[in-house]
Swiss-Prot record:
[4Fe-4S] cluster 2 binds at residues 148, 152, 155. GO terms for cellular component: cytosol. It catalyses: L-aspartate(89)-[ribosomal protein uS12]-hydrogen + (sulfur carrier)-SH + AH2 + 2 S-adenosyl-L-methionine = 3-methylsulfanyl-L-aspartate(89)-[ribosomal protein uS12]-hydrogen + (sulfur carrier)-H + 5'-deoxyadenosine + L-methionine + A + S-adenosyl-L-homocysteine + 2 H(+). One of its GO terms (molecular function) is 4 iron, 4 sulfur cluster binding. This is Ribosomal protein uS12 methylthiotransferase RimO. Binds 2 [4Fe-4S] clusters. One cluster is coordinated with 3 cysteines and an exchangeable S-adenosyl-L-methionine.
Length: 441
């Protein structure tokens, strides 16, 4: 006999956009089975916590979230990257109902079913064709693969999520098409290593509409560019074939934006990280990219205070940044990660040195960012609207990804809508953001 009311699930999603997509997939299945989402733990039938386990600080955040769920509800299912090594969770919270690792969707659903059976059997017409999304309606993350074949010395992602497993290109494109049909204006392409897409399946073809499409970075990006939405490429490893997509950007098929986590510039540090070390060639490539696509925006992340990083190495990084002129930069102070080979490296860096170098790096980047944004004053930029304010509206240019990059603050004579793409005249710039007025629709 069916239960009278729909079971309610409270959901916490921590970590990176890849984990957010995992959460969306779990929630889509739960909604298809008649479960409802609760806004608060208190009063929900269950709480699911999708954890992050990449850094110690992320593990502490995950444990705190589990603790809050246990205190306010008591019925907690844990999944995600930290769940791949459950001992710490079990020691802190032995009463959790279930612990699973990342991408183990069926195990999570089984745990939910055991604790609170579904209201009815799943019928996919109970959820929208594009599935349930945790992002605003006008943009969505599109995950094209799982896992990673690289073995960076500071990273345990392959241990947590396994080796590269690429989705068929046809499946990715069908998901993207549904998202665009549902009103998504911006597709953020993500994976652990986006530019390695298809390597594991030898670029196998799969059917898409009336043709076959290869599971290859360039081919997929080109097809996504035909769907009529902004296409933004994230987590791109700097392989030589990345050069090929710059033409798509110059032609306006995908956004002139590349998110490439270089991590450092010193060849010695990069070798210790087990990352590509030819940074002089990288500077040449960046120069060629910008010659081919002058509007190209580069985002990157860097680690300071890596074991063995000398003052000379750090100065090399600062000088490299001056030449590369990275538009958007995220910086992290090195943290040991349990199970990472870098833990065994000699010459660990003191915390106060890490902090001092981080401060200097961010100050240098602030000046670079301000200089590059100032060049946009007087230009016209397309802006996608994210938030409507009483007097000023917040949006993003093609050079800005949501949450991690800068913003464009606009005044407009007529009301604007979230998700609308407008043309803005840029009036002024500060260190990280642009300010302007709407000049066209």
């Amino acid at each position: 006999m069916q239960q009278a009311t729909a079971p309610k699930i409270s959901f916490v999603s921590l970590g990176c956009p890849k984990a957010l997509v995992d959460s969306e997939r779990i929630i889509t299945r739960l909604r298809a089975e008649g479960y409802e989402l609760a806004r608060k733990h208190d009063g929900a039938d269950l709480v699911i916590v999708n954890t992050c386990g990449f850094l110690d600080s992320a593990k502490q955040e995950s444990l705190a979230a589990i603790g809050e769920a246990m205190a306010t509800n008591g019925k907690v299912i844990v999944t995600g990257c930290m769940g791949a090594e459950p001992e710490q969770i079990e020691a802190a919270y032995p009463g959790v109902l279930s612990i699973t690792g990342p991408q183990q969707y069926e195990s999570v659903l089984d745990a939910v079913h055991r604790a609170r059976p579904a209201l009815h059997n799943p019928h996919l017409d109970l959820v929208p064709p594009q599935g349930v999304r945790l992002t605003p309606r006008h943009y969505a993350y599109l995950k094209i693969s799982e896992g990673c074949n690289n073995r960076c010395s500071f990273c345990i992602i392959p241990k947590l999520r396994g080796d590269l497993v690429s989705r068929p290109a046809g499946d990715v494109l069908r998901e993207a098409e549904k998202l665009v049909a549902a009103g998504v204006k911006e597709l953020l392409v993500i994976s652990q290593d986006t530019s390695a897409y298809g390597v594991d399946v030898k670029y196998a073809e799969s059917p898409w509409k009336d043709r076959a499409v290869r599971a290859k970075f360039l081919d997929l990006a080109s097809e996504l560019g035909e769907l009529g939405a902004w296409v933004r490429l994230h987590y791109v490893y700097p392989y030589p074939h990345v050069d090929e997509v710059i033409g798509l950007m110059a032609d306006g098929k995908v956004l002139p934006y590349l998110d490439i986590p270089f991590q450092h510039a010193s060849p010695d540090v990069l070798k210790l990280m087990k990352r590509p070390a030819a940074q002089d060639k990288t500077l040449d490539r960046i120069k060629r990219w910008r010659e081919q696509c002058p509007d190209l925006a580069l985002r990157s992340t860097f680690i300071v205070g890596f074991p063995g990083e000398t003052e000379r190495d750090f100065e090399f990084l600062l000088e490299w940044l001056d030449e590369a002129e990275i538009d958007r930069l995220g910086a992290f102070k090195y943290e040991p990660v349990a199970g990472a080979p870098s833990n065994a490296l000699p010459d660990q860096i003191a915390d106060e040195v890490k902090q001092e170098r981080w401060n200097r790096l961010m100050a240098r980047q602030q000046a670079i960012s301000a200089r590059r944004l100032k060049r946009k004053v007087g230009t016209r930029q397309q802006v996608i609207i994210d938030e409507i304010g009483p007097t000023v509206t917040k949006g993003r240019s093609k050079a800005d990804a949501p949450e991690i990059d800068g913003a464009v603050y606009l005044s407009s004579r007529r009301p604007l809508r979230v998700g609308e793409i407008v043309t803005a005249k840029i009036d002024r710039a500060d260190a990280y953001d642009l300010h302007g007025t709407v000049a066209g629709f």
